[in-house]
C-alpha cells in the first residue's frame, strides 16, 4: 500500500496531539473538528501533491481549511441555484465567502509554485500523474488553468469529506456508550499494540468498526445534498415519469439515508443494521439498506477516492480507540443546544456547503485505562 507510510506518519502526529491533551493535568478537552481538519489536510497534501505542510504541528497553513470552509458557503448556494452568480449579486450576498475563496485560490497558486521549485516526476503522488497525463485520443495534456481547477477540487475533496466523517464518528461513539464499548473492545482485542495497526487482514476483521463508520456516513453524509446531473439526449424514464433531455435531476443523499422504508429508525445510530445476524438485521434488510446508501455517490461520477477514504478512516479511528479513552462533554452539549437537527441533540448536524460544515465535537480525552 504505497500511501500507508504517509497515513501512519500523519496518524501518529494526530495521536501525539491527542496525547498531549490527554496528559494535561488541567483536563483533556479538544475540538475534534479542528484536529480532523488539520489531519486530513496534511494527509491530502502529501498523498495527492507530495507536499508536507504539517498543519497538525505548524500554524502557517492552517488558514487554508478555514478559507475553504468560508468559500464553500457561497459555492454550496450556487450548486443549488446558479442564479445569484448569473445576476452578479453573489458578491453582495457572500463578501466574506468570496474573500475566503480568494485566500484558498492564493494557496493553490502557492502550491503550484512550490511544486515547480523541485522535480516531483515519478514520486508516485496523485498530482504527478495528473501533470503528465495525456488524452488517449488526441495526446493533449491538461492546460495550466485546468490543472489549477483540478487542484482546487482535489484539495476540497481530499480534506473536507474525510474530516467531517472522522469527527462525526467520534461524536456518535461518544454519545452511544454500547457502541463505543464494543468497538473499543474489538480493536483492542485485534491488536496487542497500536504499532501493529496497519491496513490488512487484521484491520479488515474489525467488522464492527467498519459498521460504525458506515452508520456515521448514513447519519451524517459529508455531501448531503442532491448532486445534479443533466439528462442527456433522448430523455429518461424515472419510475412513472418521462423527463426530457436537458432537465437536471438529483437525489438528496441526506434524505435518502433517512428514508425509513430503507433504514428503520433512521435517526438512531445503529451500526448493527449493516451486519447480517445482528439484532433484527437479515441479509435482505442489509441489502435493502445498501440499495439506499450513497455517501460517495454512484455510477461513473462516484468518488474516485472511496477506497482511500475507508482506509484513512478505519486506520485513524482504530489508532485512536486503541490508545485513548474519550467521552462527550457538557461543553459539546451546550454547543449544540438550540441548533438541533431532525435527529435532536444526538445528531451530528452538518450544514450544506457542498461538503458538510460542522462544529466540534468537543471531547474529553484521557490515556487508555
UniProtKB/Swiss-Prot annotation:
- Give the UniProt keywords, A-Z: Heme, Iron, Metal-binding, Monooxygenase, Oxidoreductase
Q: What domain of life is recorded for the organism? A: Eukaryota
Q: What is its EC number?
A: 1.-.-.-
Query: What InterPro entries has UniProt attached to this entry?
Result: Cyt_P450, Cyt_P450_CS, Cyt_P450_E_grp-I, Cyt_P450_sf, Cytochrome_P450_monoxygenase
- Cofactors required: heme
Question: What is the similarity comment for this entry?
Answer: Belongs to the cytochrome P450 family.
Protein's name according to its UniProt entry: Cytochrome P450 monooxygenase apf8
Source taxonomy: Eukaryota, Fungi, Dikarya, Ascomycota, Pezizomycotina
